[in-house]
């Protein structure tokens, strides 16, 4: 079974899951007005190399965990490519009760088909939309640039508040992580791991400084 996890920031303690897979996550601390990305310099490479990491979802199922403040949701996340090339994403518990049902058109337009009332808050819906769009990995690369820290390459895609960074190894053979950033620091970090037949076996999304409410 594939695994998908979305969590809010970790504050005082590390959050650990105890099953056959293990997540240990800690919040990253920043101080002053210095930028987490100030060490990046222009790099060499083709921004389009990240397209090879776009998940080839046709009809995929994940065992999913979503933590929203005091609420913990677990169940099955279905991702299905529809005949019109849109993508349908449904999160439900194991007896079929839906938590949310979203669609993304081929052009990336978002539709909220359904969401559970306790989750139906503007900030939560916006965060879920942005998170899922991030891991579907269909960025517009028209204004993208390649930066480097001399260890990894960062394909920087401008967004309204900063950049989405697609971090790869120097040769762009491995997707290290995806970061949605403000102008100074990452606010969301996504990891797509253990690709098999074009599909990540595990997906982990963590918010660094945002509390769902």
Regions found by a protein language model. Give the residues of each.
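Short, basic, low-complexity termini and linkers enriched in Ser/Thr/Gly/Pro
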Residues: 11-26
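C-terminal motif of bacterial Sec signal peptides marking the signal peptidase cleavage site
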Residues: 29-32
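Bacterial signal peptide processing site
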Residues: 34-37
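Post-signal-peptide N-terminal segment of Sec-exported extracytoplasmic proteins
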Residues: 53-88
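Hydrophobic/aromatic beta-strand elements that line small-molecule binding cavities or substrate pockets
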Residues: 75-80, 102, 190-194
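Membrane-embedded segments
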Residues: 87-100, 104, 110
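Acidic/charged, solvent-exposed loop-and-adjacent secondary-structure segments enriched in E/D, K/R, S/T
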Residues: 110-142
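Gly/Pro-enriched, hydrophobic low-complexity segments
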Residues: 152-213
């Amino acid at each position: 079974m594939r695994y998908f996890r979305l969590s809010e920031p970790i504050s005082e303690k590390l959050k650990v899951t105890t099953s056959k897979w293990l997540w240990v996550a800690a919040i990253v601390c920043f101080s002053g007005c210095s930028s987490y990305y100030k060490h990046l310099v222009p790099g060499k490479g083709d921004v389009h190399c990240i397209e090879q990491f776009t998940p080839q979802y046709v009809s995929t199922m994940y065992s999913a965990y979503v933590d929203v403040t005091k609420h913990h949701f677990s169940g099955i996340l279905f991702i299905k490519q529809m005949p019109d090339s849109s993508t349908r994403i449904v999160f439900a518990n194991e007896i079929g009760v839906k938590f949310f049902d979203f669609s993304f058109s081929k052009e990336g337009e978002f539709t909220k088909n359904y969401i559970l009332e306790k989750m139906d808050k503007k900030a939560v819906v916006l965060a879920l939309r942005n998170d899922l769009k991030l891991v579907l990995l269909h960025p517009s690369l028209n204004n993208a640039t390649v930066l480097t820290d001399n260890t990894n390459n960062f394909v920087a895609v401008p967004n309204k508040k900063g950049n989405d960074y697609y971090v790869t190894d120097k040769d762009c053979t491995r997707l290290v992580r995806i970061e949605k950033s403000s102008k100074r620091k990452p606010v969301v970090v996504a990891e797509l791991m253990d690709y098999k037949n074009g599909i990540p076996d595990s997906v982990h999304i963590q918010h660094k400084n945002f509390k769902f409410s």
